[in-house]
Amino acid sequence: MAKTKPVKVLFHSRGADQETAWCVPLAKRNLYRLDNILFLHATPTFGDVIEAKENAEGMLTCKRVVKPGGRFAMIVDYPRPEDFKVLVKLLRSHGVETEGMSKGRLYLAVPKALPAKDVFQLAAARVPG
């Protein structure tokens, strides 16, 4: 079976803080699975199923979360560029999805079974600062 090609979907807060992210179309019309971590919004989160429809300009736009994917958003800051790969490997080994946008900051989609406190402790034990 061929893999469905991701599409860009627009996310915003009442018109502000606009950003786009990759989403995978699902079988049911207007439903997509978020395949990125958003930088400007805590929700929706990686893996959530969302409803998206075209806006007046023809851009797919998120309308609502249909089914949560079981993750929450977090940010972990780190002091040195070489810490990025170390943290990504460590956190992914615990089921955490990661994305970097700017130096020193890692955006996370953490499984709800892993408490935020544990994520910070894991990171602090491996990376100084």
Task: Tell what function each PLM region has.
Residues P81-G129:
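Helix-rich terminal scaffold detector
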Residues L26-N36:
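Short, structured beta-strand/loop micro-motifs enriched in basic residues and often containing a Trp
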Residues M1-K28:
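Short beta-strand/loop turn elements enriched in aromatics
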Residues V66-R80, R105-L108:
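Short glycine-/aliphatic-rich beta-strand segments at the starts of folded cytosolic domains
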